[in-house]
Regions:
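Short, well-ordered amphipathic alpha-helical segments that serve as non-catalytic structural scaffolds
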Residues: 67-76, 206, 244, 281
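Conserved small/polar residues in nucleotide/adenosyl-binding loops
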Residues: 294-299
Length: 301
């Protein structure tokens, strides 16, 4: 049996929507999944052996239902090449179904592994388009690929994205409750239509959110994170979230909102207040759920 060299990739967790930036804004966090692939010629891709360590061990699907393998197959199909199966090792730090981009991380991992196997024929923008097609929206995918704070839009079936560096003095404080909330279920909670007033308010809010990041003014985040499109409809699905958010606000965070579609809550703060804010968020959740806490810088690559 001929065994080839090992290929590898590391992909960050991401927080998407970021309050008023529904389906368009995302940011990479300093928490990572790693994926390693060793080709074995005698195996077909979907018959690859998968070893999973960390988050998702015992839960993540194998075979044709595995998202890493699906992305590998999609990239191979796009470039017109066939890649063999092999030994796939996943070392996961990103919690599943918590609003931290676990599915995007899996798809990006597979796309990058396949691109390496095919000779690195695709650039990052081409990978972004392929993975967005698989994921359905670019808000998590873009920061998983480019890092930093990304704003993205799909225009004529092509993803346009720009990246901005989050201020070094900001900390992301992430409270992760011990239950899952599937993106599909969170989307079902949203209304089919919105009032003009709500849409105008969100346009104004996202303008302040962009100003906060680009001008490095944390005090603008409270206005910038105020959302009327998804947050009010998803909060009732997350027991303890309102208490966690109120506690973070009382402790002086710049702003706080749902991470992705939830149930994770993310606050932004100065480094000096990060621990105190995180403890207050955990305290808000503790009447309902056990809660994990991460304090992170933005990941820039």
């Amino acid at each position: 049996m001929k065994i080839h060299k090992k290929y590898g990739v590391r992909v960050p967790a991401t927080t998407a929507n970021i309050g008023s930036g529904f389906d368009t804004l995302g940011m990479a966090l300093g928490l990572y999944n790693e994926a390693y692939f060793t080709p074995v010629n005698e195996l077909s891709l979907m018959k690859s052996h998968i070893d999973i360590q960390g988050e998702g061990a015992g839960k993540i699907k194998h075979g044709a239902d595995n998202m890493v393998l699906q992305a590998m197959q999609a990239v191979a199909g796009k470039v017109g090449k066939e890649i063999p199966g092999g030994e796939l090792k996943l070392i996961n730090q990103i919690p599943l179904a918590r609003g931290m981009g676990s599915s995007s991380a899996a798809l990006v991992s597979g796309a990058y592994l396949a691109n390496q196997l095919c000779g690195n024929v695709l650039n990052r923008h081409e990978i972004l388009n392929i993975v967005t097609e698989l994921e359905g929206h670019p808000d998590n995918v873009a920061p998983a690929i480019f890092g930093g704070f990304c704003f993205s839009i799909v225009k004529d079936k092509f993803v346009l994205t720009e990246q901005w560096k989050i201020p070094d003095t900001w900390k992301a404080v992430v409270a992760v409750p011990d239950f899952e909330l599937r993106t599909e279920d969170a989307r079902c909670a949203l209304p089919d239509t919105y009032s003009r007033e709500d849409l105008v308010q969100n346009i104004g809010a996202v303008s302040f959110l962009m100003a906060a990041v680009m001008m490095r003014r944390g005090e603008l985040l409270k206005v910038g994170l105020a959302d009327r499109i998804h947050v009010p409809y998803r909060l009732p699905l997350i027991s303890g979230a309102e208490e966690a958010m109120k506690n973070a606000d009382k402790k002086g965070c710049y702003g706080v909102t749902i991470s992705g579609s939830g149930p994770t809550i993310i606050a932004f703060s100065s480094a000096e207040k990060a621990y105190e804010i995180g403890a207050a968020m955990v305290d808000g959740f503790k009447l309902h759920h056990v809660c994990l806490l991460y304090t992170s810088d933005a990941a820039d690559d």
